[in-house]
């Protein structure tokens, strides 16, 4: 791809704004600011031990998870980049117990930004791909946000995306008009369009799940995975491969490129906790992206984006990816009711 013919993220968004007329200028600017923050996070991640940002920070987030130094730094980068631009009413993050209203000394906009600043951070110290996930909603109360302002189903998202900090740094985005992938050109500092209209194959022979939890699974999940593992001699009549990175952004990015199903089910260890992944800033944005790429995403019993949130840090079971496999495992849950 010649430099002269490259489409940068800024150019892509401006063209979308002109062609479809459904990408408001404030939303375009917000996406560009988030992408710029992801560049800064990528830079800090890539420094590794040289940047004195590896290891734990000696604190826990609202979920009781030990925070890594890069968790906190990435959260601060996203807050600092977005608080002053005038596009947001408030932000919410995995790393903060409550929402962050835009300070009174800055102009406020009509959007809400929800994010997981560094997904897969347990992999930081071993140099496995990690990333940032974000979701954008309109503030129903204008520019004066409350916690309830965020509690909208995923169908209300106006944009969602993620960045993967791996061998290449990529930024995947949807505004409800397909899914596109941009790769960071570090020499010039630009996001360059490298994949357009990404599509997930309807069928797959790959699945992603943490098999070490198999003894805790409920029957529908156990039935589904047992059938996959039975291979050609089993009821599916085909061989399946398991892939598990323990980094949602990396697993979903693989599925977006070559198909597969990602599963993080609820299990019997904590019957009162419906799953581990957070609805607002993990499941919803990833579901929006996957559906826009022709895939499906459910909790096992309902479409993820139709779940009505009850809290910023609500958890849900997640089954997403290739449409026919998601349909099958969801059907097994229906049969077990």
Swiss-Prot record:
A GO term from the CC aspect: cytosol
Catalytic activity reported: beta-D-fructose 1,6-bisphosphate + H2O = beta-D-fructose 6-phosphate + phosphate
InterPro entries: FBPase_C_dom, FBPase_class-1, FBPase_N, FBPtase
Keyword Cytoplasm applies: yes
Cofactor mode of binding and number, as noted: Binds 2 magnesium ions per subunit.
Binding site for Mg(2+) 1: 94, 116, 118
Keywords: Carbohydrate metabolism, Cytoplasm, Hydrolase, Magnesium, Metal-binding
Binding annotation for substrate: 119-122, 210, 276
An example Gene Ontology molecular-function term: magnesium ion binding
GO biological process, one term: fructose metabolic process
Family to which this protein belongs: Belongs to the FBPase class 1 family.
NCBIfam families in the cross-refs: PRK09293.1-1, PRK09293.1-3, PRK09293.1-4
Name the UniProt record assigns to this protein: Fructose-1,6-bisphosphatase class 1
Organism: Burkholderia cenocepacia (strain HI2424)
Gene expressing this chain: fbp
């Amino acid at each position: 791809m010649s430099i002269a013919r490259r489409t940068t993220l800024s150019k892509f968004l401006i063209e979308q704004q002109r062609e479809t007329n459904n990408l408001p200028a404030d939303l375009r600017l917000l996406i560009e600011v988030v992408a710029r923050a992801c560049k800064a996070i990528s830079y800090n991640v890539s420094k590794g031990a040289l940047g004195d940002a590896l290891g734990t920070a000696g604190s826990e987030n609202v979920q009781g998870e030990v925070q890594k130094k890069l968790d906190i730094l990435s959260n601060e980068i996203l807050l600092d980049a977005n608080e002053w631009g005038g596009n947001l009413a408030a932000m919410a993050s995995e790393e903060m117990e409550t929402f962050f209203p835009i300070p009174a000394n800055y102009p406020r906009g009509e959007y809400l930004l929800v994010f997981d600043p560094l997904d897969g951070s347990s992999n930081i110290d071993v140099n496995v791909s990690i990333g940032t996930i974000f979701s954008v909603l309109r503030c129903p109360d204008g520019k004066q946000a409350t916690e309830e302002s965020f509690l909208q189903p995923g169908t209300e998202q106006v944009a969602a995306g993620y960045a993967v900090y791996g061998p290449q740094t990529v930024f995947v985005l949807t505004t409800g008009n397909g899914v596109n992938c941009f790769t960071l050109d570090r020499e010039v500092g630009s996001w360059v369009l490298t994949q357009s209209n990404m599509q997930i194959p309807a069928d797959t022979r790959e699945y992603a799940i943490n098999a070490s939890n198999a003894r805790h699974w409920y029957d529908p999940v156990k039935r589904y995975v047992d059938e996959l593992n039975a291979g050609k001699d089993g009821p599916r009549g085909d061989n399946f491969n398991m892939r598990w990175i323990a980094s949602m952004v990396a697993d979903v990015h693989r599925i977006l490129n070559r198909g597969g199903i990602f599963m993080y089910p609820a299990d019997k260890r904590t019957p009162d906790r419906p799953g581990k992944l957070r609805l607002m800033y993990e499941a919803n944005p990833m579901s929006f992206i996957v559906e826009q790429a022709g895939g499906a995403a459910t909790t096992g019993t309902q479409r993820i984006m139709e779940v009505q949130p009850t809290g910023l840090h609500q958890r849900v079971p997640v089954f997403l990816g290739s449409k026919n496999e998601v349909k099958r495992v969801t059907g097994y849950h229906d049969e077990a009711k």
